Amino acid sequence: MSRPLLFSALAGALALLSACATTQPSADQIADACDLLTDNHDWYKALRHSSKEWGAPMGLQLAIVNQESSFDGHARPARGPRKFFGLVQGDRPSTAYGYAQALETTWEQYKKSTGNRGADRHSFRDSVDFIGWYVNNTGLQAGVGQYDYKAHYLAYHEGAGGYVQGTWRRKTWLVQRANHVAGQAARYESQIKHCKALRPKFLGIF
């Protein structure tokens, strides 16, 4: 391959990698769902699709992603202390990964249940569809109302069985976190509702 063609190929590859990369949103964007979803319109479409499919409010989905991963599609739980005189990395406390911090076993259940066999935990679209599916299931099993954001997050963390049994009652830190998620979900829902940039355009023109 000649040098000009090689440089051209390299430039094309770099451009493709750049286009595929997802930049983690800034703190200002995370604070405002309107700005966040206007700048990431594919995320808005994914949230809307999941909401229509499963009934999970978009604000709740977004608040769970923020709490679980801070919008980092490759997030994992922090490792424990290093072992063997610091020569070996510590273990992670769970298999949680991706935007939704879904566990491997629960993710496999989601793929089998929905038929979405190619779903990836680092995909925002797949992650919010997972959240919608999970919220719908735990809502039905635990009798949680659609807009009871606090209860939904507690069930997301503890599972439907744990929520019904009240395992969360002994975890003050979790109740505080659920209150925070509920407040953010309500703010996100309001911001999305009043965001002019996200409203359908007439004939795609106005």
Enumerate the language-model features and the residues they cover.
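Catalytic glycan-binding domains that act on GlcNAc-containing polysaccharides
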Residues: 22-206
